[in-house]
Amino acid sequence: MAAPELKGTRVTVVGLAKSGVAAARLCAREGARVTVTDRRGEAALGGALAALPASVTRRLGGHDAADFTGADLVVASPGVPLANPEIQAARRRGVPVWGEVELAARFLGGLPIVGITGTNGKSTTTALTGALLARHRRTFVGGNLGTPLSELVLSGEPAAAAVVELSSFQLEGIERFRARVAAVLNVTPDHLDRYPDVDAYAAAKARLFATQEPDDVAVANARDPRALAMAGASRGDLHTFGFGAPVPASARDEGGEPGPGGTAIWYTPRGRAPERYQLHNRALRGRHNRENAMAAVLCARLMGVPGEAVQAGLDAFPGLHHRLELVAEGRGVEWVNDSKATNVDSTFVGLAAFPAGAPRVVLIMGGRGKKAPYAPLRPLFGGRVKALLTIGEDAPAIERELGDLAPTEPCGDLPGAVRRAAVLSGPGDVVLLSPACASYDQFASYEERGEAFRRLATEQAR
């Protein structure tokens, strides 16, 4: 795929989040006459504006239709729906509309790319796959995970491969972007404020496979019918992973949990003996993370990473911040930060990562609720939850729906909950922050909430 000739062309970049800024910088570097436009005003965009070259024209607080219909190219940030009236007007005029990923990919030539999508688990699987590949070759890791793909082009740094997390929003804007290995982890209803139904949401994700060639590889969760169907439409070779997934060329696990004793992942190459990879790493605890690890092992081996490098990468993977992250340990108590669990489904997965039996989890929940019931968590409380500590705006609802299942105390805020957790926990226990709520009632973001928990837990663990 030849790099586009942008010198002297009129490019409009819509949306000034990280990917929009990176796209604008790349187009300006290539000599385009760049206009950026965002409905937000200057006060809300200070940091983004400061990162733009002086040559870039800024259109803030709204859009001018002429910037779209008069452009040679429109680059839309992932947060901008392609149903936007100005974007539709540009398309009617024959103006190409790309996403930032599409723009960047056109400058990357034949760089082998692993593209990973799915409703849940994308970030962990992308980071783990990147860590495994990095033990074999110089690898860029980014996309929706944090660093826009355009930053790789701008950096000029050599890379032998890229592992890119791709959201449905990003995949809407691809035309020729091609993943050497394309993986879909799962598909469940999400972003239905942007898509009319789950079929439209799945169709956006399926675009990842539509651009593959016969010598590419499609990877799918064998137990997810939507994922399997979309990957099966690829012109590439289909490989599967999952619990009890069939051979040939599959990855599956043998049960158990990471930690002492551990579990293992089996990879079965076509025509060769199965390979066994030990999974001891507590950063990958939980059934969902075992599934993520299966996908990562499969992608890495299909990209030619040697088996010994895969095992070393699994052992060393530190996990991602705020996702079942062990942040402190002391007096025999583990303190686990799952602040990224901003909805009930995520807390369900987090709590299920701990074995049932004698109740050992002191659970901190609460924040700004999302008008979803907490009752789906009830089956997990028995044999797991030693005490429930509530914080934030939705504490009364949590107490009402779950408070009969374990000793429950309203604590008001996170510092109060952590102090109380230190009193209630003992050797062998886990203090788990898994809020099932957004953070905005008391924190600016789930990251800020997680960092606050890290500091407070570290103090208590001393």
Swiss-Prot record:
ATP binds at residues 118-124. Its main location: cytoplasm. Cell wall formation. Catalyzes the addition of glutamate to the nucleotide precursor UDP-N-acetylmuramoyl-L-alanine (UMA). It comes from Anaeromyxobacter dehalogenans (strain 2CP-C). Pathway: Cell wall biogenesis; peptidoglycan biosynthesis. GO terms for molecular function: ATP binding; UDP-N-acetylmuramoylalanine-D-glutamate ligase activity. This is UDP-N-acetylmuramoylalanine--D-glutamate ligase. It catalyses: UDP-N-acetyl-alpha-D-muramoyl-L-alanine + D-glutamate + ATP = UDP-N-acetyl-alpha-D-muramoyl-L-alanyl-D-glutamate + ADP + phosphate + H(+). Its EC number is 6.3.2.9.
